[in-house]
Swiss-Prot record:
Family listed: Belongs to the TRAFAC class translation factor GTPase superfamily. Classic translation factor GTPase family. PrfC subfamily.
Protein name in UniProt: Peptide chain release factor 3
Recorded GO MF terms: GTP binding; GTPase activity; translation release factor activity, codon nonspecific; translation release factor activity, codon specific
Residue positions binding GTP: 18-25, 95-99, 149-152
Subcellular location: Cytoplasm
Main location: cytoplasm
Pfam families, alphabetized: EF-G_D2, GTP_EFTU, RF3_C
Function: Increases the formation of ribosomal termination complexes and stimulates activities of RF-1 and RF-2. It binds guanine nucleotides and has strong preference for UGA stop codons. It may interact directly with the ribosome. The stimulation of RF-1 and RF-2 is significantly reduced by GTP and GDP, but not by GMP.
InterPro entries xref list: EF-G-like_DII (IPR053905), EFG_III/V (IPR035647), G_TR_CS (IPR031157), P-loop_NTPase (IPR027417), PrfC (IPR004548), RF3_C (IPR032090), RF3_dom_3_sf (IPR038467), RF3_GTP-bd (IPR041732)
Length: 533
């Protein structure tokens, strides 16, 4: 048991969240590089670039230079602990889509992590998607570290950025590093806790020219000139006006330690990675419908937070991403697939480095493993060593955009149904079958999602489909006594459909119609989100 406890204590599982173009994918690459997981940190460049980010593995992502699915990457990271001894952590990094149209996949991924890194663009500050994602983190009181990026560009003042984070996101900021200049005048950062100055070298491998001890170091005046005295004055003001780091407040999701840097130049990234390992919590306890599951429990438990089809077109595979919540996984172990009430032997679980995969011999609480899925595993499914648990808090969100699927070749109807069913089970889209017709209606939280579905249907399933507009304003899951739902279907069945799980959904043609229908059927609940169970 002691080795189980120590293995779990080494784990750090986190996601990176940001608004599009804040530099999240670049930061992901550089974290992997500093962790020794990749040899060359390839930037996401123009459409025809030869190299693509490790975490952007789907063909469409490579074309567009945006992340449209969440990638999972695991790597060991050795750092120097406070006592000077080397300490090795196992880092599980979940790269999430930054584009606003892929938020549902991001929301679900945030249920699988124990902490998150929020990337803020120093030029643009807090942006819309950052606000949405932080609110999802807040629902679970997820600890957040902040990385203010692009210090090599002319941006807003650091004090202004911290004020905006506190005002807009309602979270205390505790600066851990402080920038020396900005843009062309950017010379490095001062570490407030360690009293060290880290100088910036835009041409060096790791972005750092030198590290000097102490603000009073005369070497600082020689290198920085007049900027040295400006820095001393600024740090005095910062120490007086800002919050000092409070680990308890950080772990409660009420305070965020803030680091400054330039990911594209590798600067500040290693400090962030060290902080992630030092400050972020190891795997946390998880709620189920019946009890709390502690990570150090001897028996394995885990839940599916994502399903991805065709990660490798050569394999035509579907992988269920499982967050290990407690205990230890061993290759070949027999687990109860709770929703199916069946015991299955898991022989071919894998760990990930984006699309690269390795067969897993063992995994511990906090790790993410991939389980081959032949159509029986769904989002939210639970695997245990026998206990019939159901983990809570894995959401499905009401779509905001709707399309009707139509085929150019009617002979491909079976392939269309299979493709849409699989993509819906992944959570890439939601599929609805209206009770009153044979149509297939798709729902998504962002309009670009339909482009992704069309692209994947064509390239992975050989189906050329057209998505036409559908007169639907919003969707609500129906909850209530079966007799009450039957009454609603009898009166308004033309607006009722079944979702992929076979649950009844009301597809409202307008918000006025929804309000009137709710008034007519007060004993039926119309739900905007559905817990995936």
């Amino acid at each position: 048991m002691s080795s189980l406890v120590s293995e779990i204590a080494r784990r750090r599982t986190f996601a990176i969240i940001s608004h599009p173009d804040a530099g999240k994918t670049t930061l992901t690459e550089k974290l992997l590089w500093f962790g020794g997981a990749i040899q060359v940190a390839g930037e996401v460049r123009a459409r025809k670039a030869d190299r693509h980010a490790t975490s952007d593995w789907m063909e469409l992502e490579k074309q567009r230079g945006i992340s449209v699915t969440s990638s999972v990457m695991q790597f060991p990271y050795r750092r120097e602990a406070a006592d000077g001894k080397a300490e090795e952590n196992i880092v599980n990094l979940l790269d999430t889509p930054g584009h606003e149209d892929f938020s549902e996949d991001t929301y679900r991924t945030l249920t699988a992590v124990d902490s998150a890194v929020m990337v803020i663009d120093s030029v643009n500050g807090v942006e819309a998607q950052t606000i949405k994602l932080l609110n999802v983190c807040r629902l679970r009181a997820t600890p957040i570290l902040t990385f203010i990026n692009k210090l090599d560009r002319e941006g807003r003042s650091p004090i202004e950025l911290l004020d905006e984070i506190e005002d807009v996101l309602q979270i205390q900021c505790a600066p851990m590093t402080w920038p020396i200049g900005m843009g062309k005048a950017f010379r490095g950062v001062y570490h407030l806790i360690d009293d060290k100055v880290q100088l910036f070298d835009p041409h060096g491998d790791k972005g750092t020219a030198a590290i000097l001890d102490g603000l009073d170091n005369p070497e600082l005046d020689r290198i920085l000139g007049s900027q040295a005295d400006e820095l001393r004055l600024e740090i005095e003001l910062v120490r007086g006006a800002s919050h000092t780091f409070d680990k308890e407040a950080f772990l409660a999701g009420k305070q965020t330690p803030v680091y400054f840097g330039s990911a594209i130049n590798n600067f500040g990234v290693q400090s962030l990675l060290d902080a992630l390992c030092q400050l972020s919590p190891p795997p946390l306890a998880r709620n189920t419908e019946s009890r709390v599951v502690e990570p150090q429990e001897g028996k394995f438990t885990g839940f599916v937070f994502k399903i991805q089809a065709n990660m490798d077109p050569r394999h035509r595979d579907r992988i269920a991403f499982v967050r290990v919540c407690s205990g230890r996984f061993e290759r070949g172990m027999k687990l109860l697939h709770v929703s199916q009430a069946k015991t299955v032997a898991i022989n071919n679980a894998i760990t990930f480095m984006a699309q690269d995969r390795n067969t897993t011999e063992e995994a511990y609480a906090g790790d993410i493993i991939g389980v081959p899925n032949h159509g029986t595993i769904r989002l939210g499914d639970v695997f245990t060593e026998g206990e019939p648990l159901k983990f809570t808090g894995i959401p499905s969100f009401a779509p905001e955009f709707f399309r009707r699927a139509r085929l150019n070749n009617p002979l491909k109807v079976k392939q269309l149904q299979k493709g849409l069913q699989q993509l819906a089970e992944e959570g890439a889209t939601q599929m609805f079958r209206p009770l009153a017709s044979n149509e297939l209606v798709l729902g998504a939280v962002g309009i670009l999602q339909f482009d992704v579905v069309a692209h994947r249907l064509e390239h992975e399933y050989g189906v050329d489909a057209i998505f036409e507009s559908h007169e639907c304003a919003t969707a609500r899951w129906l909850k209530g006594a079966p007799a009450e739902i039957e009454k609603l279907i009898a009166k308004a069945g033309h607006n009722v459909a079944l979702d992929g799980a076979g649950d009844h959904v009301y597809l409202a043609p307008s918000m006025v119609n929804l309000r009137l229908t709710q008034e007519k059927f007060p004993d039926v609940q119309f739900l905007e989100t559905r817990e995936i169970v």
